[in-house]
């Protein structure tokens, strides 16, 4: 691919990504004008949908209506959910969510031991809804981003992906690629806009992973954005 054609392709891909994000960005701006009502409605929907789960029954979700009501649910940390997540991993349903758990996503483990976070289809959709206005605002605030490529690192594979309990897990452990956080069109665009091949995520050795990532980044002359979550 010639340098000129590559630049035109990158510009076109970035412009298409911005165009795809604009409706979601506009809806987000509208929602910011009535934050309390939007958040209250979302909370009610979550409580209603999960009122019959083990967690929902334990905390009487069917009797909660407002954010103030929800204050009766005690603060917790990850250890409080370890047994429930273990049950989900062995195939139990309706534990924390009424919706089926699509996968358990490991955290990076940079500050504490790696955790397994249950992801449902709705949660993945909410991530996509949150990413869309963020991407649009980046492009609008920094138009020069349209001229180059991006590097995103959400869940780097700098640790062995599996644990003993993962071997017989009834639920998939981990996204195959960070682009799964995105919508279908955006995932297709990442193939052109991300300089580090998705296959690098399959490298399990931390030093090799970091070396190969750095190698591809150093080769990219038009890198405009680095986003590490």
Residue ranges of model-derived segments:
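Active-site phosphate/ATP/adenylate-binding loop shared across adenylate-forming ligases
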Residues: 2-33, 37-38, 43-229
